[in-house]
């Protein structure tokens, strides 16, 4: 079993070497050095988290909260660094999703969809 763990550590290192990860890391450092961008991003992420928690608890999000979230999104999207960061997060998320599909492929043989007819 240690072989699977060794491969996971190799994958971790390979992911850290991707341009997508390096770009995201650099953008985080730039935002941390920019007090305005950092505060804007923190406020936006807090609002996102609050709304997600409400949804998970089955609480309906008000029209006012939805508008506030949309306004916050538009505001942070206009900030060049934050916009680049969000794009970089999305690109890395695609890679991680693809890797997860590959890693869990063997489980599809057990739990997945029936084989497709050709």
UniProtKB/Swiss-Prot annotation:
Coiled coil: none
HAMAP family in the record: UPF0342
Record family assignment: Belongs to the UPF0342 family.
Protein name (database record): UPF0342 protein ABC1519
UniProt source species: Shouchella clausii (strain KSM-K16)
Lineage of origin: Bacteria, Bacillati, Bacillota, Bacilli, Bacillales
